[in-house]
Amino acid sequence: PNFGGYKLDLNGNLKISTTVAKGVELNEKVAELKEQGYITSVTTNSRGVTTVTYKVSMDDGVESTQVISLGDLQKAAINICNFIMNSIEFANANDLEAKSLNELYADALQTITSYEKDDVVPSTTYSTITEGYDWGPAISKVVVNVGKAMSGNIDASAFEVNVTRKALNGFLLGPSRGTRNVTAAYVSDANGNKAATGNYITLELEVGPDLSIGSPFNYNFFGSGHNEYVDTAYEVTLNKELKAADGSSVNFAANKFAADTTWICDDFDLDGKFSYNDEKFGQIALTYASYTPEAAKNDGKKNALIIWLHGAGEGGTDPRVALLGNKVVNLATDTVQQYFDGGAYVLAAQCPTMWMDNGSGQYTSDGTSKYTAALMELIKAYVNSNSDIDASRVYIGGCSNGGFMTMNMIVHYPKYFAAAYPVCEAYTNDALTDEMVESIKDMPIWFTHAKNDPTVKIGTIDEDGNFVSNGNYSPKAYERLTEAGGSDIHFSLFDDVHDTTGLYKRADGTPYQYNGHWSWLYTLNNECKENIDGEEVTIWQWISTKSKTNRGLEKVIAKVNALNAEDYTADSWAAVQSALAAAKAVAADQNATRTQINAAMEELVADRAEDPGTAG
């Protein structure tokens, strides 16, 4: 049962026949094996073709983690026969040779397909479930079609799950084959949902930031420079007895792929395509994924739009990569959606190269991007085609390359966006002119970065353990905007990027450390927080309150917040505080009308009159 290091996938005893051509002598080993019972018969037909029938048992002590099914062996043998029949040598053979070869082929084909079918492990289908994690996507579950009704508890140790991964383009980084650890097993429906009875068994698989064997992605380092899907094949086999609900034995080799379900990602429209004819760069094609909140369809109100711009590794033409490479799917979960009345639309735009492409195919050195106009036209087209979107509440952000593009878009179109959230942004300080700073200082902006970012480096740690900025990127942009008078500019600066779930740890028990460039995890997990007006506010809670319509009101609120009580009488200060509280409530109301906003602003201005009265 050992075929080149592979274990033949059999169940119990099975007879296999081998055809031996006329004139080939059998050695004494055949007689020896026949005497031992491994060979059950040796027969020769009228044409001199000998058939040797073997009895194969899997109790022969063959140790191998790699399994090949009998069906695969048959297919391979048939393919070899077909190759011989179609070869030039065969075509050039004389009639007599061709006739004998034809006869031999017929005999071989017959013996290849003549086996005891009832004893063969039945092949069945499986489906996979993919989820987005902090480190990227992973296949977390395999759903096996057992073909029989199952019930009760399922022993997870009864299953062996093997996987092979093949890069469709370029070299594969990481393992090409391996075994997945099964952490749980249960009866389910076809979608992997637990069930009391059902014809399916779902296997939960171990996942983690270092278990790349479970990833459907490969980073094409030597090619596109993007994350790309790999060809993934699973095989699930049994290593223990399994009983169906009726008590009958269950056996299978699940090796026929049926479908993949990618949680949350499948809730997006993944077919977005947009074309733009740029005056300088010619025809530009963009792809995109978009999400429509279910509640927004019939709530009778306009809803916000969140725009995400991917990093360099998520470019290309497959929007799934842009959603899963950086856990952007979280924008469609309650983690973010809970703050938006009726939910928020999500637009994840994707460029074929990288946002920092200045038209040469290389990284920009002057802060320009060939995609600037094309992206703006895509955004406008998407907003215009969805009448339910509130054009005064369009928020733009992204990470790394996408952080660069976020800055690029707001300095080119400062009046279009209600707020921005650049993460580990790569827009250099040299490219950010004073005029640009002046144009966006009144826009609400929340920066995020990690001190130990090795890609977009923002500083160093001195000998005393203090962070020293290098005067570039997020820290410098934040500094310049606040010094210019920006009153709603925020910055979450983290020491590092580490696991916050408690699930993944280092050998010493401390949280698993991700690459310091990955500060987008804090943004997408809503873990950026700041104390604003005495209240701890998260980044998405903050973004959800921003609107171009109430930006004037927010500026007045900021000025009133800076007033001092000692400059007012007790009564006048109480009036100011009352008007301030009312104004804040209006500013936070996502459905506030222009009339309500103007009234709140007038009341606040009136109560903070030039002559505040006599202090006391």
Specify the residue positions occupied by each region the protein language model found.
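Preference for extracellular/luminal or secreted protein segments
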Residues: 2-116, 594-609, 614
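A domain-start/cap signature at the N-terminus of enzymes
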Residues: 117-143, 163-303, 477
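Gly/Ser-rich "nucleophile elbow"/oxyanion-hole loop immediately N-terminal to the catalytic nucleophile
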Residues: 297-301, 358-400
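Active-site machinery of serine-nucleophile hydrolases
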Residues: 305, 312-373
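The conserved beta1-alpha1 loop
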Residues: 309-311, 449
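Primarily recognizes the serine-hydrolase "nucleophile elbow" in alpha/beta-hydrolase
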Residues: 383-439
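C-terminal catalytic histidine-bearing segment of alpha/beta-hydrolase fold enzymes
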Residues: 446-448, 452-455, 464-550
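Beta-rich interaction/scaffold domains
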Residues: 550-616
